[in-house]
């Protein structure tokens, strides 16, 4: 891969949406600039009266890639937005960091990764001795950080509300001090429901440039966080390219890379190898780690009678290690030491559900809930260290069993944020699992899940490409927004109301621009009504001009206005006039 190809690949998507522009809302200090996408609307005219429609501002995750005025260079990485805030606190220090070794990228001996990241090189940061640099620690001390104020503006709440939710453990701010490029965001049930998009190469397919492109593509469509699940060669370098160019938090499953370092043999894993991998990724800037510390030796037999056994890759790795050594998981026995690493860099736990159900037949079984009890125990240990925690959840769960998952998680894990994969509500739709899971995602988001991990049409079938990523993100944005509406999140309905008004007034361009996928909406409209005149027509292709329900409604309103009647009387008077016309014409149905 040539460096130029990475830059060229990403330039192709560095554009704003039609009818939109990037705006920034300033906070209490000049360097708090909160990005939003402002959608311009055309005025209401004609029979609807003359009225200016105010632009609509929406939450934006796309970073500088959709800012026409931003100077983005993939080779250098994004600007370190939070660097000043981190430095001002005075509790961090630079140090040399660990040396990058060939095995970090899956190579042996002197063989090196084929594509090093040649951009901006910084020494990593860590907490000074005796210091804790987590947002949870600051929140519990009563400190409102610039990150919290930034989030408050994004979420339309007060900074104190953000601080209190973080201090209570009900919300987390994933924000590794070595990822200053990230724009602060929050994951918690009292905020917008967030979505995560998974990317990553494998030994079978994909390259560094494809993964960087998928990242910029996913955040364009609304991904709030990214997980790099790479398992092939160049793991370290792929992650470096992604993090240096990513404006949203990045998560990983460190056991994947640790396994690569022992040639894929689970029983050869050791605590020392895993610990070294945690520090390697911490220095790069990973914001949250999925750690399957709840998979205990005694729980493994509980999966024996399942239809689909253990389907979590991380869960299966640790189960295999436990059985091979007949010992308790080193993730569990060394959990306090892991907490020390996490608070040194402000990395959040995403406590993995290694025993999640992989089929609806296995949903809500003994193995799943036994692990959840252990995750509750680990949550309290992490909180003792002021380390941020969210809990991962299923999986495959039929609709009538979804609420029990949320209720149990809230109780056992003391309201720590819940982060679920779907869940998929049926197992019979390979190729359409973005839909089967979005049904469950909307429901579980409504019940209180804070973040939804997207599912693409390729789930269970193959690695997603760029188009699959878009499909998955949009599908999950729909689910998350539906949950926000159901929960009554402040301002959630503004965009819906604006689009409904535009639809009723046949402002087609505004309808396209207000939608989650403006390009798809325009494309579908053009398939049947491609002419430019159709963009101002007072009907659509569904019913045509004579039978358009909204046009008929407007005609009734116009008739009422002309005859000084309310709408109900206008309908009755109109019917009477039509009856007279019918009788005058001879009263025959067929003439």
Swiss-Prot record:
<dbReference type="GO" id="GO:0005829">
    <property type="term" value="C:cytosol"/>
</dbReference>
<feature type="region of interest" description="Disordered">
    <location>
        <begin position="35"/>
        <end position="55"/>
    </location>
</feature>
<feature type="binding site">
    <location>
        <position position="419"/>
    </location>
    <ligand>
        <name>substrate</name>
    </ligand>
</feature>
<keyword id="KW-0411">Iron-sulfur</keyword>
<feature type="binding site">
    <location>
        <position position="227"/>
    </location>
    <ligand>
        <name>substrate</name>
    </ligand>
</feature>
<dbReference type="GO" id="GO:0016830">
    <property type="term" value="F:carbon-carbon lyase activity"/>
</dbReference>
<keyword id="KW-0784">Thiamine biosynthesis</keyword>
<feature type="binding site">
    <location>
        <position position="392"/>
    </location>
    <ligand>
        <name>substrate</name>
    </ligand>
</feature>
<keyword id="KW-0408">Iron</keyword>
<feature type="binding site">
    <location>
        <begin position="353"/>
        <end position="356"/>
    </location>
    <ligand>
        <name>substrate</name>
    </ligand>
</feature>
<feature type="binding site">
    <location>
        <position position="460"/>
    </location>
    <ligand>
        <name>Zn(2+)</name>
    </ligand>
</feature>
<feature type="binding site">
    <location>
        <position position="256"/>
    </location>
    <ligand>
        <name>substrate</name>
    </ligand>
</feature>
<feature type="binding site">
    <location>
        <position position="198"/>
    </location>
    <ligand>
        <name>substrate</name>
    </ligand>
</feature>
<dbReference type="InterPro" id="IPR025747">
    <property type="entry name" value="ThiC-associated_dom"/>
</dbReference>
<comment type="function">
    <text>Catalyzes the synthesis of the hydroxymethylpyrimidine phosphate (HMP-P) moiety of thiamine from aminoimidazole ribotide (AIR) in a radical S-adenosyl-L-methionine (SAM)-dependent reaction.</text>
</comment>
<comment type="pathway">
    <text>Cofactor biosynthesis; thiamine diphosphate biosynthesis.</text>
</comment>
<dbReference type="GO" id="GO:0051539">
    <property type="term" value="F:4 iron, 4 sulfur cluster binding"/>
</dbReference>
<dbReference type="GO" id="GO:0009229">
    <property type="term" value="P:thiamine diphosphate biosynthetic process"/>
</dbReference>
<protein>
    <recommendedName>
        <fullName>Phosphomethylpyrimidine synthase</fullName>
        <ecNumber>4.1.99.17</ecNumber>
    </recommendedName>
</protein>
<keyword id="KW-0949">S-adenosyl-L-methionine</keyword>
<dbReference type="Pfam" id="PF13667">
    <property type="entry name" value="ThiC-associated"/>
</dbReference>
<comment type="similarity">
    <text>Belongs to the ThiC family.</text>
</comment>
<dbReference type="GO" id="GO:0009228">
    <property type="term" value="P:thiamine biosynthetic process"/>
</dbReference>
<feature type="binding site">
    <location>
        <position position="540"/>
    </location>
    <ligand>
        <name>[4Fe-4S] cluster</name>
    </ligand>
</feature>
<feature type="binding site">
    <location>
        <position position="396"/>
    </location>
    <ligand>
        <name>Zn(2+)</name>
    </ligand>
</feature>
<dbReference type="InterPro" id="IPR037509">
    <property type="entry name" value="ThiC"/>
</dbReference>
<feature type="binding site">
    <location>
        <position position="292"/>
    </location>
    <ligand>
        <name>substrate</name>
    </ligand>
</feature>
<dbReference type="Pfam" id="PF01964">
    <property type="entry name" value="ThiC_Rad_SAM"/>
</dbReference>
<feature type="binding site">
    <location>
        <begin position="312"/>
        <end position="314"/>
    </location>
    <ligand>
        <name>substrate</name>
    </ligand>
</feature>
<feature type="binding site">
    <location>
        <position position="543"/>
    </location>
    <ligand>
        <name>[4Fe-4S] cluster</name>
    </ligand>
</feature>
<keyword id="KW-0479">Metal-binding</keyword>
<feature type="region of interest" description="Disordered">
    <location>
        <begin position="91"/>
        <end position="117"/>
    </location>
</feature>
<feature type="compositionally biased region" description="Basic and acidic residues">
    <location>
        <begin position="91"/>
        <end position="114"/>
    </location>
</feature>
<feature type="binding site">
    <location>
        <position position="548"/>
    </location>
    <ligand>
        <name>[4Fe-4S] cluster</name>
    </ligand>
</feature>
<dbReference type="InterPro" id="IPR038521">
    <property type="entry name" value="ThiC/Bza_core_dom"/>
</dbReference>
<dbReference type="GO" id="GO:0008270">
    <property type="term" value="F:zinc ion binding"/>
</dbReference>
<keyword id="KW-0456">Lyase</keyword>
<keyword id="KW-0004">4Fe-4S</keyword>
<keyword id="KW-0862">Zinc</keyword>
<dbReference type="InterPro" id="IPR002817">
    <property type="entry name" value="ThiC/BzaA/B"/>
</dbReference>
